């Protein structure tokens, strides 16, 4: 999930470097015209792949495999249709187009943003998937990992360099699949009740890809009875929604949710808000022609006639208020794919026997602050004033009432240093990260564990030596992915030897989980053990260059505030407008008193005092 985006290269893998990788082993090797390892028969027809070199050996890659009919023209906004068979042999040797999306131009040329931007042409004809498999093909069925990218449901692509599957496939001998799915209005615009734009078609794209995996992955050496679905940010929220949707649940067997959860406050909207956003976008692009009026069919027909870029150019204007970590078109609680809110489905679900791995990074909120929080920029230390902190809380928790915002301020202020710019910067980062990622993930882990699931939890704490974001941002959202996918194994990317070893360890944890539902290595019982997360002990591990360290209570105090106290406070004061006004007045008096006391104490501390007492 990432705020606004700009294309076309991944700065960490610059064009000269990509050419070098291609020439000396990062690209395809010369193969005989019909290498049997690179010819596969799937239900749609025959495929020809290519052999790629990873640092320790070759893998087979089948890139740009169509799994759906192009969702263009009259198919815009509709559920995907399976790809019809093709004649002859289809070349699956290059990534295909990226789904049409907003492109980030806030920091042009900066590698920290460019690495997430589209690296292929934008098109609505984008429903393709990719398969990496060991070379030669496994002789016995091999566990399968299926990746869902993040990007706030408005951006992302399976072709990004950071999602290169060759390293994990070669190192661990697993089959890896990734797919494109529609994002933004193309994937999530919803007019609930309308057959023309039902919503959630991006999730249906993902489900169709999972069905394709069940039908075809055995041809690549994969085991369709051992499929692990994993994703990050909006990809993790998507994984969670498939867990909560019965037609999806039978298509995979284990789940990994990295820095995201379906119960996050940004991850879904209700039917009323979904319709409001859809009709507002329509008005912004001049639909229906002639102004107000018209039915859903006419409105959708008009929207289908608009150029794709028109929809992208206006989609951010449908949000109800200024915010960070909120996205225009997201999954809708439609009564179909999601029969109820994620929170209700999690509370009511039966998760006995489910195996889940969940986690967060150390500084989940920092990335989003440079996309709209007052006083923040990647180009300075972002040392904010108290006024900017207070304003930042309102954009960081945009749906909060005045009472809720005051409670957030009270909880996150260091009252011994209420005006300290660095502490205020860290506090706002924690507000955004805890509210949107850490505490929804912790809540999900606890509920799943309490209902019989076997859960493992982590916090990723290593800041990559190659990271281009400023130091104050710490370990930002999304920057564990390069280690999970094994990019440090590529020597030309200039990671340290320690980071290479660390990446190998993480790939082993993820692959072990895909194989057995347990990240621990049964071949190394003397290694530090990763214990399951339970609702009582709440054990999780820290992932960094040091050996595993077991801890308890992932941001427990902060998450008690978000998951327990704040909902009860708001419920208890729902109709108490006068009480809220009185509480605010008392709070402001107390807050002013604390600031005054601190100033007086600092003044006193600087005075000369009797040295002979």
Curated annotation (Swiss-Prot):
Membrane topology type: Peripheral membrane protein
TM regions (residue ranges): none
Coiled coil: none
Cellular component annotations (GO), alphabetically ordered: extracellular space; plasma membrane; side of membrane; synapse
InterPro entries per UniProt: AB_hydrolase_fold, AChE-related_enzymes, AChE_tetra, CarbesteraseB, Carboxylesterase_B_AS, Carboxylesterase_B_CS, Cholinesterase
Statement: the UniProt record of this protein carries the keyword Chloroplast: no
Protein name: Acetylcholinesterase
Organism the protein comes from: Bos taurus
């Amino acid at each position: 999930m990432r705020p606004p985006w700009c294309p076309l290269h991944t700065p960490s893998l610059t064009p000269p470097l990509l050419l070098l990788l291609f020439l000396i082993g990062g690209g395809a090797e010369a193969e005989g015209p019909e290498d049997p390892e690179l010819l596969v028969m799937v239900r749609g027809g025959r495929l020809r792949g290519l052999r790629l070199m990873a640092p320790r050996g070759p893998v087979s890659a089948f890139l740009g495999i169509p799994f759906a009919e192009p969702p263009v023209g009259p198919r815009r906004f509709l559920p995907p249709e399976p790809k019809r068979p093709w004649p002859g042999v289809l070349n699956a040797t290059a990534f295909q187009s990226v789904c049409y999306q907003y492109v980030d131009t806030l920091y042009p040329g900066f590698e920290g943003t460019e690495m997430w931007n589209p690296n292929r042409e934008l098109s609505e004809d984008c429903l393709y998937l990719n398969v990496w498999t060991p070379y030669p093909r496994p002789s016995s069925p091999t566990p399968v990992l299926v990746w869902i990218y993040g990007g706030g449901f408005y951006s992302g692509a399976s072709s990004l360099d950071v999602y290169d599957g060759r390293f994990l496939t070669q190192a661990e001998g697993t089959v890896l699949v990734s797919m494109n799915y529609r994002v933004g209005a193309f994937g999530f615009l919803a007019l609930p009740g309308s057959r023309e734009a039902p919503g959630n078609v991006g999730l249906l794209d993902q489900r169709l890809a999972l069905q394709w995996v069940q039908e075809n992955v055995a041809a690549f050496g994969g085991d369709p009875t051992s499929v692990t679905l994993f994703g990050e940010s909006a990809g993790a929220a998507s994984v969670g929604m498939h867990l909560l949707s019965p037609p999806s649940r039978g298509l995979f067997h284990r789940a990994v949710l990295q820095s995201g959860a379906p119960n996050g406050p940004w991850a879904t909207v209700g039917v009323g808000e979904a319709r409001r956003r859809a009709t507002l976008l329509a008005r912004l692009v001049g639909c229906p022609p002639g102004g107000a009026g018209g039915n859903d069919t006419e409105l959708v027909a008009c929207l289908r006639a608009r150029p794709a870029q028109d929809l992208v150019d206006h989609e951010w204007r449908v949000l109800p208020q200024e915010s960070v970590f909120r996205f225009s078109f997201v999954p809708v609680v439609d009564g179909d794919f999601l029969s109820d809110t994620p929170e209700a489905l999690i509370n009511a679900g039966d998760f006995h026997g489910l195996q889940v791995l969940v986690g967060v990074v150390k500084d989940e909120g920092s990335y989003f602050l440079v996309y709209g929080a007052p006083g923040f920029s990647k180009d300075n230390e972002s040392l904010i004033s108290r006024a900017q902190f207070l304003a930042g809380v309102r954009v960081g928790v945009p749906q909060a009432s005045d009472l809720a915002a005051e409670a957030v301020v009270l909880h996150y202020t260091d009252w011994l240093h209420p005006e300290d710019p660095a502490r205020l910067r860290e506090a706002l980062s924690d507000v955004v990260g805890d509210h949107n990622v850490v505490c929804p993930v912790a809540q999900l882990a606890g509920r799943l564990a309490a209902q019989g699931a076997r859960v493992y939890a982590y916090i990723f704490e290593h800041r990559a030596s190659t990271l281009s974001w400023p130091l104050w941002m710490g370990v930002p959202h999304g920057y564990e992915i390069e280690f999970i996918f094994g990019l440090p194994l590529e020597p030309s990317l200039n990671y340290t030897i320690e980071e290479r070893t660390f990446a190998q360890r993480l790939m082993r944890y993820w692959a072990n989980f895909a194989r057995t539902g347990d990240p621990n290595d049964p071949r190394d019982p003397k290694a530090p053990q990763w214990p399951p997360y339970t609702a009582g002990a709440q054990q999780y591990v820290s992932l960094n260059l040091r050996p595993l360290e077991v801890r308890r209570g992932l941001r427990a105090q902060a998450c008690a505030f978000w998951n327990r106290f704040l909902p009860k406070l708001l419920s208890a004061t729902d109709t108490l407008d006068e009480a809220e006004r009185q509480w605010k007045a008392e709070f402001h008096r107390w807050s002013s008193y604390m600031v005054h006391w601190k100033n007086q104490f600092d003044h006193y501390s600087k005075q000369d005092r009797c040295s002979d007492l």
